[in-house]
A protein has these predicted regions:
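Glycine/Thr-rich phosphate-binding loops of Rossmann-like dinucleotide-binding domains
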Residues: 91-92, 143, 186-187
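N-terminal glycine-rich phosphate/adenylate-binding segment common to multiple enzyme folds
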Residues: 54-109, 113-115
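Small-molecule-sensing regulatory modules
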Residues: 2-49, 56-59, 66, 85, ...
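Short, well-ordered beta-strand segments
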Residues: 6-8, 81, 99, 134, ...
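A conserved helix-loop-strand patch within extracytoplasmic ligand-binding domains
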Residues: 85-86, 94-150
Length: 318
């Protein structure tokens, strides 16, 4: 008998592409399983009347992208949920776990320029003074201002195509910064003008480029089905980054970057915390031997603890 798995997701084009990636994994490894994608509207979904206001921590911050989906998962309306892992809050509701990480895409941030600068600028250093960069990510804003304090930053909301149109079609700003992974999944990589180095220009958000599957911890049958979809290397790197974020208690307002790389069983993790205005930057790097998720979480937590000892409270409570 064919089994049907209900997969919950946001309704944006990117979210639906990512949900289809999970369906493709089921088709490959479990051809007898049928997937049903269930679109769920979340509090974080942008509407034109919202303007460019950033999501506030008081309103739920990152959790706004997941809470309605998680509520449906807890109720049993869906069997699992697909998320951009970087958008997941540090804490999950009781009984839910992130049990599977798909093969991770490119972790880097990409810059999209207004038409008047296309072909004339190929790096942050080359942007003219007073250039306006549109981003609602405090991490991206802080790194831009740390590297180029003579630039200006303005908030921007909306899905990926909307943000591109605001810069290219509506002249809202001179540039915007988006995750390259999302652009690639939407086949919009040709819109990219240049890519930022994840070590020297802009450390990515924790888990950027990773798609995760959230399930009920008690659902052993589904968790067994998900095992062949999990990418061990992506899982290790993402969990190390997430563990550091949890120790730092990073909110959606705290500018934090975390980037892990795995070479065999050697994990290299760099984590940075900045002040909102980019004038302060604190960084920690560790290398650890890891064989699985538990080791990765321990390494990430250790890096987070070392960094937390030197980061002023005002950088973590902004």
């Amino acid at each position: 008998m064919t089994e049907t798995i209900k997969i919950g997701t946001r309704g944006s084009a990117l979210a639906l592409v990512q949900a289809e990636m999970v369906c493709a994994g089921f088709r490959e490894h479990h051809p007898d399983v049928t997937c049903e994608i269930v679109e769920i509207r979340t509090s974080g979904d942008w509407k034109p009347e919202h303007g460019e206001t950033r999501l506030s921590e008081a309103d739920g911050g990152k959790g706004l992208f997941a809470k309605e989906i998680e509520a449906a998962l807890i109720r049993g309306d869906i069997d699992c949920a697909v998320h951009s892992m970087k958008d997941m809050p540090a804490g999950l509701p009781d009984g839910l776990i992130l049990d599977c990480v798909l093969p991770r895409a490119d972790v880097r941030d990409a810059v999209i320029l207004n038409g008047r600068w296309r072909g004339r600028v190929d790096s942050l250093d080359a942007l003219p003074k007073d250039t306006v960069v549109a981003t609602s990510s405090t991490r991206r804003a802080a790194f831009v201002l740390n590297k180029r304090p003579d630039l200006s930053v303005t908030p921007i909301r909306g899905n990926v195509p909307t943000r591109i149109d605001k810069v290219r079609g509506q002249d809202m700003a001179d540039a915007t910064i988006l995750a390259y992974a999302g652009l690639e999944r939407l086949r919009l990589q040709d819109d990219v003008d240049f890519i930022l180095d994840p070590q020297t220009d802009m450390i990515p958000a924790a888990c950027q480029g990773a798609v995760c599957i959230e399930v009920r911890e008690e659902d052993r049958a589904l968790r067994d089905l998900l095992k062949p979809l999990n990418c061990p290397e992506s899982d290790i790197c993402a969990m190390a980054e997430r563990a550091a974020l949890q120790i730092l208690d990073g909110s959606c307002k705290t500018p934090i970057g975390a980037y892990a790389m795995l070479d065999g069983q050697t994990l290299d993790l760099v984590v940075a915390v900045l002040s909102l205005d980019g004038t302060e930057l604190y960084k920690e790097r560790i290398t650890a031997s890891v064989t699985g998720r538990a080791d990765a979480i321990a390494a990430g937590a250790a890096c987070g603890r070392k960094l937390k000892q030197v980061v002023p409270d005002h950088c973590l409570t902004c």
